[in-house]
Swiss-Prot record:
K(+) binds at L172, A173, P181, V183, I186. Belongs to the Xni family. GO terms for molecular function: 5'-3' exonuclease activity; 5'-flap endonuclease activity; DNA binding; magnesium ion binding; potassium ion binding. Mg(2+) binds at D105. GO terms for biological process: DNA replication, Okazaki fragment processing. Its EC number is 3.1.-.-. Keywords: DNA-binding, Endonuclease, Hydrolase, Magnesium, Metal-binding, Nuclease, Potassium. Binds 2 Mg(2+) per subunit. Only one magnesium ion has a direct interaction with the protein, the other interactions are indirect. Residues 185-190 are annotated as: Interaction with DNA. Residues 162-253 form the 5'-3' exonuclease domain. This is Flap endonuclease Xni.
Length: 255
């Protein structure tokens, strides 16, 4: 079975860089990132490995909702400037890159989903909670910084909803980190209670007559925001990749 180690490049690099006291200090970053990738390969023993990077194009999510990820601190210029050299260094170490047009998340989700559909296995190295929605047991998530697999049970316990309700939950409660609006007036606690009672976003909106008048009014007024938020949260798993897996095969996975 092909096992593809898919590394979320900016998730890894920005967190490693954030540990530096001076954001303009990128000395040795290539060696540290290269060492991290080498450890990941040694531990997981994949047949293929790639680092997927965000691109410069405006995300389709930003076109859909202008406030998407609004207010996020921009990447330090020194870090941005060193990325080409970092990618070259990783390639010299046998770890090739995939450059997304905009957000890497959809490329990662598509690659993982297509691998599994063709009998493979994917290990996504990222702490991004958005990958929680990828439910196939042959798609695993690895937290490099805490050195453990992030399980469905762990995420369910943290959110208070079932794995299958993850997107519905964020469509209702929103996500402040990504500026996903959710339904105004429906916070995490209310979203959990609604999903425990009605099981899904569709069922909630089909049962407004069974919900208290005040809450039903909020839900009705925020229906379009719920739909928008659902679209923003949902990962695309069918975008064109135009890659050849042989580019990312490791010559000796046991090395």
């Amino acid at each position: 079975m092909n096992t593809f180690l898919i590394i979320d490049g900016m998730n890894l690099v920005r967190r490693m860089h954030a540990a530096q006291p001076n954001e303009n200090d990128v000395n040795g970053l290539d060696i540290r990132v290269g060492s991290a990738c080498k450890k990941l390969v040694k531990y997981h023993q994949p047949t293929h490995v790639a680092v997927v990077w965000d691109g410069d194009d405006i995300s389709w999510r930003k076109h859909l909702f202008e406030d998407y990820k609004k207010g996020r601190k921009p990447m330090p210029e020194a870090l941005s400037n060193t990325l080409p050299a970092l990618k070259s260094y990783l390639a010299e170490q046998g770890v090739n890159s995939i450059d997304a047009a905009s957000e890497a998340d959809d490329v990662i989700a598509t690659l993982a989903s297509k691998l599994v559909a063709n009998g493979g296995k994917a290990i996504i190295v990222s702490t991004d909670k958005g990958f929680t929605q990828l439910s196939d047991p042959y798609i695993q998530r690895w937290d490099h910084f805490n050195q453990h697999y992030m399980t469905i049970e762990e995420r369910e316990e943290k959110l208070g909803v079932e794995h299958s309700q993850f997107i519905d939950y964020l469509a209702l409660a929103g996500d402040s980190g990504n500026k996903i609006p959710g339904v105004p007036g429906i916070g995490p606690k209310s979203a959990i209670e609604l999903l425990r009672t009605f099981r899904s976003l569709a069922n909630i909106y089909a049962s407004l007559d069974k919900i208290g008048a005040k809450q039903a009014k909020k839900l009705e007024a925020g229906k379009q925001m719920a739909r928008l938020s659902y679209k923003l949260v949902q990962l695309q798993t069918d975008i064109p990749l135009n890659i050849n897996l042989s580019q990312f095969r490791l010559p000796n996975p046991n090395a």
